[in-house]
Amino acid sequence: MQIKRWFLNNSLRNYQYLLYDKSHAIVIDPLKSDIFAEFIAKNKLQLEAILITHKHGDHIAGVKKLLAIYLNAKVYAYTGNDLFKPDIYVKDGSFINLGFTSFRVMYIPGHIDDHVCFLFEQERALFCGDTLFNAGVGGVQAESADINQLYDSLVKITKLDGDIKPYPAHDYWLGNLDFALSILADDSYFNYYRNQVAELAAEDKPIVNLAEEAKLNIFIRAMSDKALLKALPDYSLGREMFVKLRQLKNNF
C-alpha cells in the first residue's frame, strides 16, 4: 500500500496519514476529516479502517465525521472515550489481517496509558503517534503519563528492524534537534540534520528509517552514547540518562 502524508500547519504541527491501494483506504489518527474524505472520494476508495494510537483530542477529532460518511469503516483502538467507541479493541501483540494488508499492534504507554502503535510489516511502516518523534520522544504531561514506561516503550521500538520507517504524528524536527545540540553542540549527526531540515517545509521533511533515527535521536542515544557521559557526567547511560534528558527537554 502507498502512504499519503499531510501536514496541517496548526499549532501542534500535526501530520495526518492515510494508507491506500487501488480500492482500499486506512486512516490513522484523524484530526481533520475533510482532507481524508476528499482524497478517498477523488480516488474512489473504500475506507476500511480507522486506527487510533491514543485518545488525545488531536488524534480522534475527525473520527465521528468519518464514521458518518463511511458506515462500514471499523475503528481499531486500545480504548475509547465519549467521542468514539472502538469496533475492535486491540492490545499488545494483536495481529489484524484485513485481506489487502495486515498490521501488528504494539502497546507503548508512557506519553499516555492507552498508547499503541501500528506496525505494517509489508509496508515497512510504523505509525507511532506521540511516542517517537523525529529526533525526539513524546511528552509526559498527561495525567496517566509515566516517564519510565516511555523509556521502556522506546526500547521496545528500537528492537524492531532498522529498515522500518516510523511515521510520527507531529513535525518537531527543529525543536528536537535544537535541544539535542544544546547538549552535544558538536555532534555531526545533529548538525547535519539540523542543516538539512532548516529550510524544508514540513511536507518535505525526510522520512527516515529506525536505523537512521537511532543516530539522530538523542533519547535513543541515551541508551548507549558515551558522549553523553561527558555532557551529563552525573547520570548513567540508559534509563537514568533518558529521564534526565526528558526532564531537561520539558523546560527547553
UniProtKB/Swiss-Prot annotation:
<dbReference type="InterPro" id="IPR035680">
    <property type="entry name" value="Clx_II_MBL"/>
</dbReference>
<dbReference type="GO" id="GO:0046872">
    <property type="term" value="F:metal ion binding"/>
</dbReference>
<dbReference type="InterPro" id="IPR017782">
    <property type="entry name" value="Hydroxyacylglutathione_Hdrlase"/>
</dbReference>
<keyword id="KW-0862">Zinc</keyword>
<dbReference type="InterPro" id="IPR032282">
    <property type="entry name" value="HAGH_C"/>
</dbReference>
<comment type="pathway">
    <text>Secondary metabolite metabolism; methylglyoxal degradation; (R)-lactate from methylglyoxal: step 2/2.</text>
</comment>
<keyword id="KW-0479">Metal-binding</keyword>
<keyword id="KW-0378">Hydrolase</keyword>
<dbReference type="Pfam" id="PF16123">
    <property type="entry name" value="HAGH_C"/>
</dbReference>
<feature type="binding site">
    <location>
        <position position="111"/>
    </location>
    <ligand>
        <name>Zn(2+) 1</name>
    </ligand>
</feature>
<dbReference type="GO" id="GO:0019243">
    <property type="term" value="P:methylglyoxal catabolic process to D-lactate via S-lactoyl-glutathione"/>
</dbReference>
<feature type="binding site">
    <location>
        <position position="59"/>
    </location>
    <ligand>
        <name>Zn(2+) 2</name>
    </ligand>
</feature>
<dbReference type="Pfam" id="PF00753">
    <property type="entry name" value="Lactamase_B"/>
</dbReference>
<dbReference type="InterPro" id="IPR001279">
    <property type="entry name" value="Metallo-B-lactamas"/>
</dbReference>
<comment type="subunit">
    <text>Monomer.</text>
</comment>
<dbReference type="InterPro" id="IPR050110">
    <property type="entry name" value="Glyoxalase_II_hydrolase"/>
</dbReference>
<feature type="binding site">
    <location>
        <position position="130"/>
    </location>
    <ligand>
        <name>Zn(2+) 1</name>
    </ligand>
</feature>
<dbReference type="InterPro" id="IPR036866">
    <property type="entry name" value="RibonucZ/Hydroxyglut_hydro"/>
</dbReference>
<feature type="binding site">
    <location>
        <position position="170"/>
    </location>
    <ligand>
        <name>Zn(2+) 2</name>
    </ligand>
</feature>
<feature type="binding site">
    <location>
        <position position="130"/>
    </location>
    <ligand>
        <name>Zn(2+) 2</name>
    </ligand>
</feature>
<comment type="similarity">
    <text>Belongs to the metallo-beta-lactamase superfamily. Glyoxalase II family.</text>
</comment>
<comment type="function">
    <text>Thiolesterase that catalyzes the hydrolysis of S-D-lactoyl-glutathione to form glutathione and D-lactic acid.</text>
</comment>
<feature type="binding site">
    <location>
        <position position="56"/>
    </location>
    <ligand>
        <name>Zn(2+) 1</name>
    </ligand>
</feature>
<feature type="binding site">
    <location>
        <position position="54"/>
    </location>
    <ligand>
        <name>Zn(2+) 1</name>
    </ligand>
</feature>
<dbReference type="GO" id="GO:0004416">
    <property type="term" value="F:hydroxyacylglutathione hydrolase activity"/>
</dbReference>
<feature type="binding site">
    <location>
        <position position="58"/>
    </location>
    <ligand>
        <name>Zn(2+) 2</name>
    </ligand>
</feature>
<protein>
    <recommendedName>
        <fullName>Hydroxyacylglutathione hydrolase</fullName>
        <ecNumber>3.1.2.6</ecNumber>
    </recommendedName>
</protein>
